[in-house]
C-alpha cells in the first residue's frame, strides 16, 4: 500500500475499513523515505489538515513527543509508590472516565509495553524503569486525556508521528 492510499484509508470509519479487508484491524504503518518529494509534502499537509479537522480523534507528533515537565513532577510524586513491574487499575485512577472499559485496556497495554521494554532495554535499576513507566503515563495524560481524545464504536483514534524517533517514543506509540 502506498503512502497516499494509507493516508486516505486511516480516516475511514471502522465499518468502511471492513470493506477493504475481511475484518477491522488497527493500522500501524511506517514509511521510510519517498521517491516523490512533492507527493510526500502533499500527504503530510493532508495529514496535518485531517488532524486539525478531527482534534477529538487525532494527535500529531512532529519529530518528538514533548514531555510536560510540570505534569511529570505532579505524576512523579503520585506514582512513586507504584510497582513498575506490573501496573494495577488503581495506579491510573482518573486517567479515563470512572468505570470506562478503557481503564483496563490501558492497564493491559501499559503492562504489555513494560514487559516489552524490560526484555529489550534491560533497565539497570528500578528507578530507571519507574521513570520509564511514569513517562508513558504522563504522555498518555498529556496527549490523550488533556486533548479529550474520543474512543467510540465507529471511529478509531489516530496517532501520527513523523521525524526521527527515540526508543521511548516508539514504546509510547505501541502503547497507543
Question: Where are the regions a protein language model picked out?
Answer:
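Conserved N-terminal ligand/cofactor-binding loop architecture of enzyme catalytic domains
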Residues: 1-12, 20-137
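Ligand-binding pocket scaffold of soluble enzyme catalytic domains
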Residues: 16
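Active-site and donor-binding regions of nucleotide-sugar-utilizing enzymes
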Residues: 108, 118-175
Amino acid at each position: 500500500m502506498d503512502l497516499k492510499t494509507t493516508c486516505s484509508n486511516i480516516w475511514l470509519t471502522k465499518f468502511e475499513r471492513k470493506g477493504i479487508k475481511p475484518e477491522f484491524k488497527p493500522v500501524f504503518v511506517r514509511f521510510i523515505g519517498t521517491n516523490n518529494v512533492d507527493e510526500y509534502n502533499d500527504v503530510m499537509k493532508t495529514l496535518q489538515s485531517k488532524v486539525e479537522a478531527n482534534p477529538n480523534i487525532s494527535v500529531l507528533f512532529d519529530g518528538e513527543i514533548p514531555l510536560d515537565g510540570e505534569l511529570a513532577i505532579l505524576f512523579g510524586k503520585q506514582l512513586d509508590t507504584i510497582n513498575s513491574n506490573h501496573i494495577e487499575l488503581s495506579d491510573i485512577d482518573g486517567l479515563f472516565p470512572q468505570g470506562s472499559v478503557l481503564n483496563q485496556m490501558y492497564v493491559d497495554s501499559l503492562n504489555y509495553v513494560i514487559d516489552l521494554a524490560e526484555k529489550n532495554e534491560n533497565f539497570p535499576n528500578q528507578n530507571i524503569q519507574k521513570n520509564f513507566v511514569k513517562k508513558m503515563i504522563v504522555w498518555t495524560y498529556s496527549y490523550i486525556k488533556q486533548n479529550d481524545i474520543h474512543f467510540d464504536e465507529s471511529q478509531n483514534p489516530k496517532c501520527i508521528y513523523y521525524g526521527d524517533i527515540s526508543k521511548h517514543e516508539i514504546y509510547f506509540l505501541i502503547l497507543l
